[in-house]
Amino acid sequence: MYPSKALQIMKSVLNGGNAPFLLGGTGVGKSAVVKQLAEELANDREIVSDVINPTAKQFGWIDFRLSLYESVDLGGLPYIGDDNQQKRAFLGNLPIGGEGVLFFDEYAQAHPSVQAIVGQIIYERRLGEYILPEGWKVICAGNRSSDRAGSNALPSHVVGRCSIINFE
């Protein structure tokens, strides 16, 4: 599939309220196509990386290379609150306002516990008490298990929650 076609499909998927998932071999340009989509969605606003609350003149870009994360990095550290209820302390790496793209790359190489956490963000746009702001789009990418890139098969709940786009 050509990058222009992938861009068109991803826009359609996002407009339908779903998360696109680019699935393809190593080095075929999946990440570059997602970055290009972010540039188009920014609509002449400044793209800012790793800013969790971009201003109206900015468009956020947060790129999680999931193979580098552990579940506590995304799921937060558990603690007991003043009300004796278990809570989670997040590390401040998830968006709290504004608009942008939350890109989960190397999804298939991530540990299954990380995949499960991201699955909740994809489907429910939340993680425990954390709620992903409306202005943020979730996009995923990864290699196929047949690519021998250390990839795991995608969990069925994630396949059901995303629109898989095969990218060559």
Feature locations, PLM:
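AAA+ P-loop NTPase catalytic core and its hallmark functional loops
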Residues: 1-168
